[in-house]
């Protein structure tokens, strides 16, 4: 299975668009300092400044990409089969890796005004990505229990991030 550190470094701020932004070099130093402190798991998403957070991580782990466990998330607007597969490839390119340790569906397709795509179609793409070795584990983030059950009918959901944030 996927090995993650007890603590995970959240990388939403890296990329500069939200939470006041962050300097790229400071972000890279933070990733290296976290690794030195025993934190080798990085949580990101293509939604974090249009993939720029993933690009910063890619720069930080260059030369040692497999020292880290990387968790990333697909935008809900890429819920169709081909869109999701392409989104994963784009994340891998930005990160400079051949695989993601965990790839999450960030939100159900219909959130934020998105067009509803059958979860079975989206999960079929996730299952194929796993079979291809592009992802090691399938994750859901911000999905209901009912949606979780539908997803599990297609393939095993390995990781679940419930919709909880102490700031909201």
Residue positions per predicted region:
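Beta/alpha (TIM)-barrel catalytic core signal, keyed to glycine-rich beta->alpha loops juxtaposed to Asp/Glu
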Residues: 108-168
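Active-site groove signature of glycoside hydrolases
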Residues: 92-113
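N-terminal binding-site loop/beta-alpha segment at the start of enzyme catalytic domains
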Residues: 1-68
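Active-site beta-loop-alpha junctions enriched in small/polar residues
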Residues: 12-14, 45-47, 73-77, 105-110, ...
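Structural preference for beta-strand elements that scaffold enzyme active sites
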Residues: 4-8, 40-41, 67-71, 99-104, ...
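Short, acidic/polar
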Residues: 21-34, 80-95, 142-150
């Amino acid at each position: 299975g996927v090995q993650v550190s007890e603590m995970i470094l959240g990388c939403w701020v890296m990329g500069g668009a939200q939470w006041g932004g962050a300097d790229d070099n400071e972000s890279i130093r933070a990733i290296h300092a976290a690794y030195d402190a025993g934190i080798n798991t990085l949580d990101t998403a293509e939604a974090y400044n249009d993939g720029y957070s993933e690009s910063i991580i890619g720069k930080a782990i260059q030369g040692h990409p497999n020292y880290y466990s990387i968790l990333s998330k697909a935008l809900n607007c890429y819920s169709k089969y081909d869109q999701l597969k392409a989104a994963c490839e784009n994340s891998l390119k930005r990160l400079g890796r051949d695989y993601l340790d965990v790839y999450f569906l960030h939100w159900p397709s219909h959130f934020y005004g998105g067009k509803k795509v059958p979860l079975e179609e989206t999960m079929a793409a996730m299952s194929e990505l796993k079979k291809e070795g592009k992802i090691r584990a399938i994750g859901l983030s911000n999905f209901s229990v009912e949606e979780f059950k539908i997803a599990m009918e297609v393939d095993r959901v390995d990781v679940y991030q419930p919709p909880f944030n102490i700031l909201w």
